[in-house]
């Protein structure tokens, strides 16, 4: 008898579920506040296409295609818009007028970063930033120059060893990463990760690169609260354990640094010094969490941009020749290449800016903002409150409406060349803008200028045949997932 009574129950459940889906589809298509924004109809009714996009490795290219089809604003999810208009960045992420609420970070995207500068609320972010600012000031950069130079010298010693006089290809991307992680470890904690010494990644570093896909997946799980526990079962076994181990490692390093008396001007010392002078405080877990963020953000992005710059230079021999001449005519000795003098290399700055345009560290979205109460105008469009808004840098940087020959690497566009007079160079903000822009921008530029100048001063560079498609083979899972960049480094 139970078997006969089960079918009506199943039919009722199925009918109810189907009715619910119909209601959701009809509402999202015809009654949702975003119903009038253009975009694929499937994206309007479910978050699944966007999630698959974020996990495919090519969200930047897919978003560009959507903007080419639908225009400067695209509905990429039931409650999510993507803008590639130059004015949208300022409207969403720029400074707000006094009394206006902030367009805050998407709670789901930053749910594990509430105790650091990445995901904290407005009040705590201000507190964290004021404390961290001491370690990133111009004066702090100059005080840390001996540390910069020591690691740059070690890098080029190792590159000379690895290149075998230019006869053996070297994965320069890997060596840049070794250097930036060692450098930021020393600047943050007063001790290196020893990547350059050991010619290998520290476990902390390797986890960041090996788990990019899983991190992108974890970031999307929260958008499906009803089935999140089941989706979590798909995360590789042991990954969460490794995350916990890295968090504990950060705590251990911060505790060790706090227990060590030193006059070296590292970040932890500068932060604690700044907290004392301001009469404010930071909990230990907050200090450790912020230090952990600085390690990844202050190293991976710099190494990525340097790798992109070297690739584009090798792919454009004339541009490489112009940069080489600028550097070698400026310096007679390698040790003269320093933080201050490299700021005067105009063509190098143009090369770095063009590399940042074509290979921005944040290329595929993944960091939306939530429109504040009352809604707001974004690039001339009124966007309702609680809408998630992406500012898609890559889709903007490659849009011919804003950049002439957008797919071509041409540093001259940054040097007043009349061919590019209408380019929206003001829209290239790879370090974001507003109160939450990247606090480490000056550090990144200092590292990039010194290392790239030294690279072209020390070596003639030639791309290995196996890395000809490095750019096309790069993938994005929150951050860039790069293949090896093998080059021949021929000593001068």
Curated annotation (Swiss-Prot):
Key words, A-Z: Glycoprotein, Heme, Iron, Membrane, Metal-binding, Monooxygenase, Oxidoreductase, Transmembrane, Transmembrane helix
Cofactor requirements of the protein: heme
Pathway listed: Sesquiterpene biosynthesis; trichothecene biosynthesis
Listed CDD domains: CYP60B-like
Domain of life: Eukaryota
Glycosylation site positions: 124, 198, 290
Disordered: annotated segments: 88-116
UniProt membrane topology term: Single-pass membrane protein
Induction: Expression is positively regulated by the trichothecene cluster-specific transcription activator TRI10.
InterPro entries assigned to the protein according to its UniProt record, in alphabetical order: Cyt_P450 (IPR001128), Cyt_P450_CS (IPR017972), Cyt_P450_E_grp-I (IPR002401), Cyt_P450_sf (IPR036396), Cytochrome_P450_monoxygenase (IPR050121)
Composition bias, Basic and acidic residues: 88-106
Binding of heme, residues: 438
GO MF annotation terms: heme binding; iron ion binding; monooxygenase activity; oxidoreductase activity, acting on paired donors, with incorporation or reduction of molecular oxygen
A Pfam family: p450
Keyword Metal-binding in annotation: yes
Transmembrane region(s): 6-26
EC number of this enzyme: 1.-.-.-
Primary site of residence: membrane
Knocked-out gene: effects: Leads to the accumulation of isotrichodermin, a trichothecene pathway intermediate.
Family: Belongs to the cytochrome P450 family.
Function, as annotated: The biosynthesis of trichothecenes begins with the cyclization of farnesyl diphosphate to trichodiene and is catalyzed by the trichodiene synthase TRI5. Trichodiene undergoes a series of oxygenations catalyzed by the cytochrome P450 monooxygenase TRI4.
Miscellaneous remark of the record: Trichothecenes are sesquiterpenoid toxins that act by inhibiting protein biosynthesis.
Protein name: Trichothecene C-15 hydroxylase
Classification lineage: Eukaryota, Fungi, Dikarya, Ascomycota, Pezizomycotina
């Amino acid at each position: 008898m139970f078997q006969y009574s089960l079918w009506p129950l199943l039919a009722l459940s199925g009918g109810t579920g189907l009715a619910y889906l119909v209601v959701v589809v009809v509402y999202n298509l015809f009654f949702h506040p975003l119903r009038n924004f253009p975009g694929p109809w499937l994206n309007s009714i479910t978050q699944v296409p966007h999630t698959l996009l974020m996990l495919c490795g090519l969200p930047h290219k897919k978003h560009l295609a959507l903007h080419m089809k639908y225009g400067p604003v695209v509905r990429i999810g039931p409650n999510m818009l993507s803008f590639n208009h130059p004015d949208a960045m300022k409207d969403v992420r720029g400074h707000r007028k006094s009394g206006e609420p902030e367009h805050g970070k998407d709670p789901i995207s930053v749910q594990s970063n509430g105790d650091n500068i990445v995901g904290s609320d407005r009040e705590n972010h201000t507190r964290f930033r004021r404390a961290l600012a001491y370690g990133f000031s111009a004066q702090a950069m100059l005080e840390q120059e001996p540390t910069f130079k020591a690691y740059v010298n070690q890098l080029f010693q190792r590159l000379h060893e690895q290149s075998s006089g230019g006869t053996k290809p070297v994965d320069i991307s890997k060596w840049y990463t070794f250097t930036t992680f060692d450098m930021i470890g020393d600047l943050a904690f007063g001790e290196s990760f020893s990547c350059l010494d050991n010619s290998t990644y520290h476990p902390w570093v390797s986890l960041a690169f090996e788990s990019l896909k899983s991190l992108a997946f974890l970031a999307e799980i929260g958008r499906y609260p009803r089935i999140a526990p089941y989706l979590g079962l798909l995360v590789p076994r042991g990954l969460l354990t490794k995350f916990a181990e890295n968090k504990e490692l950060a705590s251990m390093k911060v505790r060790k640094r706090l227990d060590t008396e030193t006059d070296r001007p590292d970040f932890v010392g500068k932060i604690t010094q700044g907290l004392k002078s301001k009469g404010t405080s930071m909990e230990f877990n907050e200090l450790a969490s912020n230090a952990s963020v600085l390690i990844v953000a202050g190293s991976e992005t710099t190494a990525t941009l340097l790798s992109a710059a070297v690739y584009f230079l090798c792919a454009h021999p004339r541009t490489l020749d112009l940069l080489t001449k600028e550097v070698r005519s400026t310096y007679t000795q390698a040790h003269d290449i320093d933080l201050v003098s490299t700021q005067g290399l105009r063509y190098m700055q143009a090369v770095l800016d063009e590399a940042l345009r074509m290979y921005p560290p944040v290329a595929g979205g993944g960091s939306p903002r939530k429109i504040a109460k009352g809604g707001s105008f974004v690039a001339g469009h009124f966007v309702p409150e609680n809408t998630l808004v992406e500012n898609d840098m890559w889709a903007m940087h490659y849009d011919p409406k804003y950049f002439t020959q957008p797919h071509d690497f041409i540093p001259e566009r940054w040097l007043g060349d009349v061919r590019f007079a209408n380019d929206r160079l003001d829209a290239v903000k790879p370090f974001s803008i507003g109160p939450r822009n990247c606090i480490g921008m000056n550090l990144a530029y200092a590292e990039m200028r010194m290392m790239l100048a030294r690279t072209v001063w020390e070596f003639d560079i030639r791309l290995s045949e196996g890395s000809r498609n490095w750019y096309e083979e790069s993938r994005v899972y929150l951050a860039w997932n790069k293949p090896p960049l093998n080059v021949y480094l021929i000593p001068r």
